[in-house]
């Protein structure tokens, strides 16, 4: 059994030249809702998302003045980022429990009949594990277990599937730590707070001026 390669963003079809990512970040793209390695930067007040495996033509941009109508939109963007999901180590399959969130490599057919499949990554929930004795090849332990999962994203959302360790990545629990992303999201959130305070102040009745109070007192 040859040793597998599970590099994030790998495709069966020819891939564009890789771009240098910010380590440890992945992003759920708006175009296909799949997860990709990425890095971010704030340029001229806009958030730029740059994919690890695509050219800059595929970059996604977020404009604070056009893409956010409420604080909920900020939360939705925040949920599109997380720490990198690492491939499941063959020796650690026993750590998985039903209900765990996984990120799985899926072969997505190309647009044409003869196009090769592209590997894209979508989330799924682990339902059951069928344990099996592990093999050892050239001194390396290789998991032979089977994992029953149900996809929560992508073209197979809601579908159940049985997969092997080769396609399984583990979704981290800890939040992402990226200064550029955090600063951008916090700035947009603060703008909503300022707008709310301005609207509240505008809705309050104007306080009486001292001269009007004196006129009212003299009339009494």
Regions found by a protein language model. Give the residues of each.
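Eukaryotic chromatin- and chromosome-associated nuclear factors
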Residues: 1-220
